């Protein structure tokens, strides 16, 4: 692990002894999940998917048992792992926690971004964006910042198609986005 040049020390935890081990927040706590395979060069798709699922299941168990409230996943072949059961990892994780309303958040202290839709081809995005979806996502993000980070967020909803007003008299931003922002402001959410 020295090759990664982490500033914190690493600690390997025994998966079977987790309830007897104390989590040290000053270290990076790792759990090695064995990949059972006799042929190291070629992993069959089913074995890869099974391994990824075991890793996720352990992570979900650790979250549910209160060992952590964070999850970082590395790159995986979502198409093969999810096998058309979910649009993406966000939806997969939501299903494992029985959550119907979720938001994907790319978080940074200065600027965070949350797309209204996830894992959709661009041609389907405009059909999915509704006033209800905008309200749902803004409330999810607002609640996250207030309850988890104890911050009062300033939320900006960017236009769905900002240059459309110059063509005909149809403008999705006026019809969908702007009217929902006004509704959210009435609910005391700092959104523009």
Predicted regions located by residue number:
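Anion-binding alpha/beta catalytic cores of soluble intermediary-metabolism enzymes, centered on
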Residues: 1-192
């Amino acid at each position: 692990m020295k090759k990664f040049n982490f500033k914190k020390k690493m600690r390997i935890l025994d998966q079977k002894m987790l309830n007897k081990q104390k989590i040290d927040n000053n270290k990076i706590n790792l759990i090695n999940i064995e990949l059972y395979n006799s042929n190291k060069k070629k992993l069959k798709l089913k074995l890869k998917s099974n391994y990824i699922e075991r890793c996720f299941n352990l992570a979900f168990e650790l979250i549910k048992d209160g060992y952590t409230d964070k999850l970082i996943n590395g790159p995986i072949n979502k198409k093969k792992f999810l096998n058309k059961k979910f649009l993406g990892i966000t939806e997969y994780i939501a299903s494992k926690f029985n959550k119907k309303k979720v938001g994907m958040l790319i978080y940074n202290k200065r600027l965070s971004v949350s797309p209204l839709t996830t894992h959709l081809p661009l041609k389907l995005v405009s059909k999915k964006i509704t006033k209800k979806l905008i309200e749902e996502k803004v409330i999810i993000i607002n609640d996250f910042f207030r309850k988890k980070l104890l911050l009062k967020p300033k939320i900006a909803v960017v236009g769905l198609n900002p240059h459309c007003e110059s063509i005909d008299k149809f403008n999705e931003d006026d019809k969908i986005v702007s009217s929902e922002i006004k509704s959210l402001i009435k609910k005391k959410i700092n959104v523009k």
